Regions:
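Long, highly charged, low-complexity intrinsically disordered interaction regions
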Residues: 1-12, 21-24, 231-232, 242
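Short boundary/loop segments of OB/S1/cold-shock single-stranded nucleic-acid-binding domains
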Residues: 40-60
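Structural detector for short beta-strands of small beta-barrel domains
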Residues: 56-77, 115
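Upstream accessory/linker segments immediately N-terminal to the RecA-like ATPase cores of bacterial MutS
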Residues: 72-264, 636, 669
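N-terminal pre-Walker A segment at the start of P-loop NTPase domains
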Residues: 267-277
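Inter-lobe coupling/hinge segments of SF2-like helicase ATPases
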Residues: 275-278, 289-610, 624, 665, ...
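C-terminal accessory region of SF2 helicases/translocases
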Residues: 599-691
Length: 691
């Protein structure tokens, strides 16, 4: 029998080109895709409930006879059908209806309908029920299984998806959908047969535990989640092997430049910086590409570690590229590296999207001629950027860069043959759960020591009814010679509205604090204008900076000791932690005021409570993952990572240790099963194996 992964959806009855196109929109191209497109939830239509026994809020199947159908005129015209079954009367209400529909619901018609029961003006009602007429004497049986509700898209009805899954299930068997988990592994980890799991999840029996299914703890769900997580783990192991099989430039440990750099620095690196620096120096001296993630909490001194790595490559005669996700952050790196490297006679080149014309041409020429240190934004990934001898790529805040961009960078190595070493830095600590799954292809170093002189930030929650007091607090801090940030957060995912809110707040604060010099920075300003404002704030010419979350990452103004964050309940914990990290960079006591808008939801209260209790980024990251889930944390929208079909990282975290062991066993004893698994679960993700 043909494998269902090879059979297109057009082989199903009723699927022509137009429907195939709609199915492709939700990633359904083969019969295997249809079978792995699992229901989100289930409805119980296996029993008929008497009208007299109905309760508001319940979903129910009801049978009865139409006692009348009238058009009701009110604020909205609706068709009201009265249904009786001997135990009571129920109204069916339709706001969208045709004359033909009204004619089909005439008095005496026998109906079976399904929907949510609600209280109405004249007793219980169901709005827009699904219904069918029961004609003739032959009874039509109720559903034999729970009814699946599938993820869908415009133009794809539940009815249609159920018909298609029914046809695909009829073709399902061990030969049409091979089980690539060896029997021994399945036995060791108590995993049931694949085809039985899929059959169960599409059509659970009437006595299935709906709650267990809703929580994702049923054996059939765990069987599929295990296989999906296992495949993801295998893809990362493959990725690692692929990278290791390539040659990279060998960069011997340097001494001359790092010594001079540290002497000029004016402070001693922390023990953690020295330890991580040594791990990186060892990796760079090998002839296989380094893939190392350096995690450090806000202010842990990752940039110094990156500079030491860069000097090792430069002393060996190679080029280094440092990329940051925003122009503000890239510019900050450029200024830092210029300050550190120019005294060592090392040229630092700059390339960002805003460079145009002659300046851009000159920058490209310098890079092509071998400028040792190149700093920029994602503009460095573009085809026209040609490096002479790129040996090390430093990527700041990696999960803001997409997989494609990491690929593009790989191809810019020495002569297109040697693969550059990659050092990835993030100030968003990655929870262990995610590190075990999403970043299993990277070696990890942790900077767990803050440099001396950093002060902890005192965080307080204040309701926005006390806004005037908060404004006075800003005045007092600025009078003492300190500086402050006032952050306006995202409004309904609209950058435009957020920028307008920032402008309004800027006008309000400029008027209330007339004697202070107030600046404004938001995402819609031109990069050059943003840079001017940031520079003025850094130099102390502005005392208060009103900003949107564009200042979240990497901005360093040691004299700023007060931050006000408006509507903090709209942000995730990791983002709040990043914002708070902009203060507490000097020796003065620093404060962060979370100016919230009551009433707070339960999650909002928990989230802000965590911010008040801890400043440990790793604790915050674990909590953020619990409250938000992995996709948001990793910025999956651009990484293509971790968009699982069945698995859920938080829910299935306890499977991960077993999944890792199973991946090792499979690679060691059944390597021939790896490719079919990758093809099944990551069919469109094969290019990620190149990253």
């Amino acid at each position: 029998m043909t494998e269902l992964s090879r059979v297109p959806v057009t082989a199903l009855k009723g699927v022509g080109a137009a429907l195939a196109e709609k199915l492709a929109r939700v990633g359904l191209e083969t019969l295997q895709d249809i079978l792995f497109h699992l229901p989100l939830r289930y409805q119980d239509r296996t029993r008929v409930t008497a009208i007299g026994a109905l309760r508001p809020g319940a979903d129910a199947v009801v049978e009865g006879v139409v006692a009348g159908a009238d058009v009701a005129l009110g604020r909205r015209r609706s068709l009201l059908v009265r249904l009786q079954d001997g135990s009571g009367t129920l109204s069916l209400r339709f706001y969208h209806f045709s004359q033909a529909q009204k004619d089909g619901l005439k008095r005496g018609t026998h109906l079976r309908c399904y929907g949510e029961v609600r209280p109405g003006a004249s007793g219980l009602e169901i709005y827009h029920p699904e219904y069918r007429a029961l004609n003739g004497d032959e009874p039509i049986p109720v559903e034999q299984t729970l009814t699946p509700i599938y993820p869908t898209t415009e133009g794809l009805t539940q009815q249609r998806l159920r018909q298609l899954s029914q046809q695909a299930l009829a073709m399902l068997g061990p030969s049409s959908l091979p089980d690539w988990l060896p029997a021994e592994l399945a036995r060791d980890y108590q995993l049931g047969p694949l085809d039985q799991a899929i059959r169960y999840l599409h059509r659970p029996p009437p006595d299935a535990d709906i709650e267990e299914l809703a929580e994702g703890r049923h054996w059939a769900q765990l069987r599929l989640a295990f296989e999906e997580l296992l495949t993801h783990q295998l893809s990362l192991q493959r990725l690692r092997e692929a990278v290791r099989s390539q040659a990279a430039p060998r960069l011997p440990a340097a001494s001359r430049l790092p010594k001079r750099f540290l002497a000029n620095l004016g402070f001693q690196p922390t023990g953690a910086q020295r330890r991580v620096g040594a791990e990186i120096a060892y990796d760079l001296a090998q002839d296989e590409p380094m893939l190392r993630l350096v995690q450090g909490d806000v202010g842990a001194g990752k940039t110094v570690v990156a500079a030491l790595a860069a000097l090792q490559a430069i002393e060996a005669g190679y080029q280094v590229a440092l990329m940051a996700p925003t122009e503000i952050l890239a510019e900050q790196h450029f200024l830092n590296f210029s300050k550190w490297l120019q005294p060592l006679d090392i040229e630092v080149a700059w390339l960002a999207g805003k460079l145009k014309g002659k300046a851009r041409a000159a920058a490209l020429e310098r890079i092509g001629d071998g400028a040792p240190m190149v700093v920029g934004t994602h503009a460095l990934f573009q085809d026209e950027v040609k490096f002479k001898r790129l040996a090390l790529a430093i990527i700041d805040e990696q999960h803001r860069f997409g997989v494609q961009q990491r690929l593009a960078l790989r191809q810019k190595g020495v002569d297109g043959r040697l693969c550059p070493h990659q050092l990835i830095m993030t100030a968003t600590p990655i929870p262990r759960t995610l590190a075990m799954s999403a970043y299993a292809d990277l070696d990890t170093s942790i900077l767990d020591e803050l440099p001396p002189g950093r002060t902890p930030v005192n965080t307080v929650l204040v309701a926005d009814s006390r806004r005037i007091e908060v404004i006075e607090r800003v005045r007092a801090a600025c009078r003492e010679g300190r500086q402050a940030y006032w952050v306006c957060t995202l409004i309904e995912e609209s950058e435009e509205l957020t920028c307008q809110a920032a402008e309004t707040t800027y006008e309000e604060l400029s008027s209330a604090l007339g004697e202070l010099r107030v600046g404004l920075i938001h995402g819609r300003m031109k990069p050059a204008d943003k840079a001017v404002v940031m520079e003025a704030f850094k130099e102390g010419m502005l005392q208060l900076l009103v900003a949107t979350t564009v200042i979240e990452v990497g901005v360093d103004v040691p004299n700023a000791s007060l931050m006000i964050i408006e509507n903090p309940e709209r942000l995730g914990l990791a983002q709040l932690h990043q914002l708070r990290g902009r203060v507490g960079r000097g020796s003065a006591a620093s404060h962060c005021v979370l100016l919230y808008h009551p009433p707070l939801s339960q999650i909002g209260r928990e989230r802000l409570g965590i911010m008040r209790e801890t400043s440990d980024g790793f604790v915050i990251a674990e909590k953020d993952l619990e409250l938000r889930g992995p996709g948001e944390m990793l910025g999956t929208r651009q990484t293509g990572l971790l968009q699982f079909k069945v698995a859920d990282l938080m829910r299935d975290a306890d499977l991960l240790p077993a999944v890792r062991d199973a991946a090792q066993s499979l690679l060691a004893h059944w390597p021939q099963h790896v490719s079919p698994l990758l093809e099944r679960w990551l069919r469109h993700g094969q290019q990620y194996g190149q990253v």
